[in-house]
């Protein structure tokens, strides 16, 4: 690619695509839940149907955009920290090699609209796209790293994300248990 800045907007567009598909799917599910609880008809007395749909979409889109943006920031930081520790690349050539990987997320974001009927399928698709990006990352930089540096890079990335996911799950379990313990039984 001639201009290295051409792909600079791909991560933002991919985040917008994934957050839009997730928020559409979540909005449809929330509308079903509101209808099953009998709240939707009461809401129609005060708001139009389009207004309710738009408000739900905007709220979920903002939530998913913030989460995906934070994950992108964390992922970039961990990748650059891993490269700092294990790559002998003071000019940053490895980072330039990884720029085209944003096309993987862009394509995944476009294809996520096929899976709008179920949030779980979109999350699974996001995990598959993330795994494909990780394989792309390792493939692009393996020639510049020694075997031990490559193993260290992979282990640091995997260990961080494993610890991060386990930590988030632990926090949600603790929160759930504290809410359940505070309920009068």
Curated annotation (Swiss-Prot):
Subcellular location: Cell membrane
Protein species of origin: Bacillus subtilis (strain 168)
Classification via Pfam families: DUF5366
Lineage: Bacteria, Bacillati, Bacillota, Bacilli, Bacillales
Protein name: Uncharacterized membrane protein YufK
UniProt membrane topology term: Multi-pass membrane protein
Transmembrane segments: 4-24, 54-74, 98-118, 119-139, 153-173
GO CC, one annotated term: plasma membrane
Alphabetized UniProt keyword annotations: Cell membrane, Membrane, Transmembrane, Transmembrane helix
